[in-house]
Amino acid sequence: AGPHARDLLQKLSDDPLDKETFPYLRHRRITVNGVSCLAIRLGFVGELAYELHFPAAAAVDMWDAILEAGKEWDIRPFGLDAQRLLRLEKGHIIISQDTDFETNPWKVSMEWAVKLDKPDFVGKAALVRAQRRTPRETLVPWQMEPGMATPPEGMTVTIGGNLAGRVTSSKMSYVLGHPVGLAWVVTEHAKEGGTITIGGAPATIAG
């Protein structure tokens, strides 16, 4: 993952990786460092990224080859904590942490992922019904002012002293300099720029 991900991967593969040939949210079989891989053009963080799936026996050699190929850009591994923060800054949801069994695409502003004009598919009827209903609550990104403490995940959200939702994810963004997160908020108040209260502290619904 990173701004040079495509250039780095191209050094290890003869297969075309340009954005026209291999666009976002597509997958294909390519050869990387001599290993056949299922490559997926997507990212968990807000950067150009690829997922590579290949036999575990090739993992050490692949790791070494990627780090060697990336020396000109001074690439470095990053851990789970950094990944989870970057995904939150991007607004990328984690299934089961930010969602539950009642979640549908319209509740999380991901209606673009559903094509209801396709022929019948498993779950289509339920999605059609969900589309017709205004969701009771909506998942929104939020942010606090610099210097404020990061609220714990699971903290209640209130508006005007009334229960209005709950925090699903929260982290201190060291790049932005303030806490950020995701929360379920009653839909009528889930508007960009709106003010919510998390654990007694004010937060702003982000775009």
Regions found by a protein language model. Give the residues of each.
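Glycine-rich, acidic
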Residues: A1-Q131, P135
